[in-house]
Amino acid sequence: MLKALNLLSLYTKDVEASVSFYKELGFELVNNDGSVAEVKLGDVRLQFIAQETADKQDESFQKDAFGEPKGTGVYIYIEVDDANAYYKQLKEVGITPSTKPRDWPWEQREFVVRDPDRYKLVFYEKLS
């Protein structure tokens, strides 16, 4: 029986840049040894793995780290209280969202931000 989804591992070119970016968004740093770091928001953790560590792994890890575009077709959804206010807050600290807040038929207001490795984060507010 499934219990919970609590960790996403993402290969990154620069662990420190990813940690800094996600801390700016409001994530909490869990640990950072320089080649692997974790941040968390609520019960979900994001793990950043330096691409160069894949050189020390088997071929399947190397393919994941280097061979394919990062985040293609994947959107990581993060709920916020007020999408417009959070959009403005990010712009004020120098983070440029990819899209402006938009209302969708599924009754959410959403906007997208790309992280330093181009992973797509969707910040959304429930409208109903």
Predicted regions and their residues:
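Amphipathic alpha-helical segments
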Residues: 14-28
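Short, solvent-exposed loop/helix junctions and linker helices
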Residues: 12, 77-80
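Polyanion-binding surface elements
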Residues: 9
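Short glycine-/small-residue motifs
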Residues: 120-123
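Vicinal oxygen chelate
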Residues: 1-6, 28-78, 87-114, 125-128
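Conserved active-site tyrosine of GNAT-family acetyltransferases
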Residues: 18-22, 90, 118
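Short, conserved charged micro-motifs
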Residues: 17, 83-87
